[in-house]
């Protein structure tokens, strides 16, 4: 019995000194395992008399329970300490700002369209929309584009049939507006247009903004002043701007507008001119009473110049590495 008492006392001391769960498991095996010290004590019962066996068996069983209880308490204590230490290590400072969710940004082409709409909106221009599938009257005939003009060729225009096509410019919106509204008119018509072309500076689909002003006594000086102010506002620079004589079937006189680039070279940015009298007649407006001017610009080209993008196709490839630069 004395030996059993010493084994229990020794086990309890060692259990208290154990610093981790592995050490406790080693103690369990050393005392309660198949070859453990308590198990060895049970083997001594074979040498005892029948009278001694019950008391000895009870003592061994009590010793085993005492050690097991101590092990359980110590295991629970170590697990609690480990959990507390882990919680302290993972403590969250609730006063810190939370993780913000990444949000999307406007596409650079959309930014440009909104910038254009804002500028002309402040000048009293309203935004008009029209169909992207257009008929030949609104896309060509009403714009004074002759039947044999190169723009009507199959290699330039996407035709559904001889009378229906994907619009090649948003000028059709101007025609539709003049058909349904009377002067004075101030409108811009942003939207997608389609031409059969694809390279570094052209895509089959691109965006265009065209503008129209029709009223009495409208002159080219007004057109120059508005476009000059627009370009300086858009590029946020005191740009050098020039107007070059050009030709468009729907305007007379016509001009192309250039700005001086940072490399010292002129860069074409838009076309413009006074609305051709034939265009006004085609929609029932008297050219003897009213005059007007029109202008058109490629949105992607303006965006490329504003942000220094070299390849127009980058706007349509949906590469987040590219698009995130404009957030």
Curated annotation (Swiss-Prot):
Enzyme class label: ligase
GO biological process, one term: phenylalanyl-tRNA aminoacylation
Catalytic activity: tRNA(Phe) + L-phenylalanine + ATP = L-phenylalanyl-tRNA(Phe) + AMP + diphosphate + H(+)
Residue ranges that the Swiss-Prot or TrEMBL entry lists as coiled coil: none
Keyword tRNA processing carried by entry: no
Subcellular location: Cytoplasm
Keyword DNA-binding: no
Cofactor annotation remark: Binds 2 magnesium ions per tetramer.
Disulphides: none
Cofactor(s), names only, from the UniProt record: Mg(2+)
CDD domains referenced in this protein's UniProt entry, alphabetically: PheRS_alpha_core
GO molecular function, one term: ATP binding
Alphabetic keyword roster: Aminoacyl-tRNA synthetase, ATP-binding, Cytoplasm, Ligase, Magnesium, Metal-binding, Nucleotide-binding, Protein biosynthesis
Pfam families in alphabetical order: Phe_tRNA-synt_N, tRNA-synt_2d
Assigned GO CC terms: cytoplasm
Binding site for Mg(2+): 252
EC id: 6.1.1.20
Quaternary structure and partners: Tetramer of two alpha and two beta subunits.
Family: Belongs to the class-II aminoacyl-tRNA synthetase family. Phe-tRNA synthetase alpha subunit type 1 subfamily.
NCBIfam families found in the cross-reference section: pheS
Protein name: Phenylalanine--tRNA ligase alpha subunit
Organism name: Shewanella baltica (strain OS223)
